[in-house]
Amino acid sequence: LIDEEIAKGSKGQIVIKANSVTDRELIDKFSEASCAGVKIILIIRGICCILPNIHGKTDNVMVNSIVGRFLEHSRIYSFGTGEDQKLYIGSADIMTRNQDRRTEIACPIKSPEIKAFINRYIRRSLQDNVNRRVMLPNGEYAMPDSKGKDPFDVQEYYLSHAIHLSKSKTHDKSHHKIKYEAKDKMQDKKLNLSFFDKFFKRSKKK
């Protein structure tokens, strides 16, 4: 999958959400992809042994970390964009123990609706300016630039949405869900998956 994105060059894209990145072989592969022009966006809550924005190595790698109210364990692996996107969910981190010493299973997402939902979740995670931190080339973390933006906590967003639905009557739930999905679909049509490309470019300018 990484090789497929490398073959696309600057049109390639990899987005991964996991707890840790420590496997040297895959880190080297990410570096190879970065050198080929592939945009790599990582959302890694804990240990991350790849340094972003190192000239000639990881110029096209961005590392984010979100540590909020809830201890999340979701793993998402996305390769490519648009109709060519291959999206998986699973339980494996990018660690040697997962890659070499365990039998891990990743589930491909075929449903367009579920794929869109997961893409929106990733997009909103990257818009978090309360708990998200961005790794610097020296390995330290800094808050993203949120000047002129309202505070946005992705975990609180999904929590408040779930609470709102749970308090609604059955018919109201359906109505709200339709309005909610219509709004999201409109955003998807407007932003498509080019959001990640625009997000990456904005972040690189800072």
Describe every region a protein language model picked out.
Residues 1-206:
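PLD/PLD-like phosphodiesterase catalytic module centered on the HKD motif
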